[in-house]
Amino acid sequence: MKSTLIIGCGIAGLTACRLLESKTAVYLCEKDRIGGLCIPNLDYYDRAIQENGYAFGAYGDHMFHTENPYIAKLFKSIYPTAVAYEHRTEIFVNGKFLPYPPNIKTLQHATVDEIVAPYTAKQWGEQSTDDITHILKRFTTYNDYDYRTFKDRYQYVPYAMDYGKPFISPDVDTLDITNHTEMDYEDVLECDHDLIINTSPLDKFYGKDFLKYRSLEFEVGIDYGNNFKDRAMTINYPERTFAYTRVHHHGKYIVYEYPSETGLPMYPVYNPDKSLELIRKELPELQYHSVLGCNCRFFVHKCGNKIILHVGRLGSYQYLNIDKAMMSTVGAITWLTVQENFFQDK
């Protein structure tokens, strides 16, 4: 049986683990966070469960939403304790709390330019119109009074209960999780695994530093005045008056979210007109593959008898929702199975 090493154990790595556990021997390499950004804040876990009945995220509110029934079922197999939940978000602009994404009510009190452009520049650190145009295209407006953040058929929160612990088959060797430091290309060349699935930052895997990332910092406070009782769970603050970009409130706990250029890489500063061209220039050995019917991709690197797949938000260097990060991984493993016959005994 072939052997697979998965680098990183966020949603893309967990998806690969779930899909491959019956096909190969699977080894996980992760320093400290099983679940990636979808983990609860363990410092406040017991108190939050006791006082609110649920936990809140260590890295803000991360919600799974999709129209794809296969991806929804796969997500539930990874997070069996995930809870069905429809999120609400507001934005504070012109002195008012308004629904977000903008709906009819929002646009009665503020323009799209007042809402989207300043928030995008603040969150991503991009100032020029050329830099943020591709980011603005991701935003949507609703021609109704629906307050929900997402309208997808399947919506879950992964970490509400049971520590948000993802399912990992007992057949998967997890010994490497706490013993490994970060692995890179040189380490991979020396390992004995046939397949390597990388979900860590693409350029840094090859010992380079040509791609931009954004990070976030979080500060937990107490809402002694119960000021957010009737507000949405997440509130966006686009105006420069506020240093933070979002506030997440969970009972009396208030989590302030600040953008940062340093720290744990969380979001690729991806420009579709520039980033892919730069990747092809700096890493010409990579093969590019798009996933059919999905605005996501993966990269393939064949080196000797090994195959390296780069998937997920950081591995494929794309800004992706949870479902699209999973689809990047599903697409890569499907390609490996169908096009390469990789898992057939030879």
Question: What is the meaning of each model-derived region?
Answer:
Residues T15, Y70, M327-G331:
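Short amphipathic alpha-helical face segments that pack within enzyme cores
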Residues H87-E90, N94-L195, T199, D203-Y206:
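Active-site/ligand-binding neighborhood in enzyme catalytic cores
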Residues M183-F298:
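Mid-domain catalytic core of redox enzymes
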Residues P272-K346:
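C-terminal catalytic lobe of FAD-dependent flavoproteins
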Residues R47-V112, P118:
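Dinucleotide-binding Rossmann-like beta1-alpha1 core, especially the glycine-rich loop
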Residues E21-D46:
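Glycine-rich FAD pyrophosphate-binding loop
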Residues K2-Y27, I333:
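N-terminal Rossmann-like FAD-binding beta1-loop-alpha1 element of flavoenzymes
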Residues G10-A12, D32-G35, A121-G125, D184-E186, ...:
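Short, solvent-exposed loop/turn segments at secondary-structure junctions
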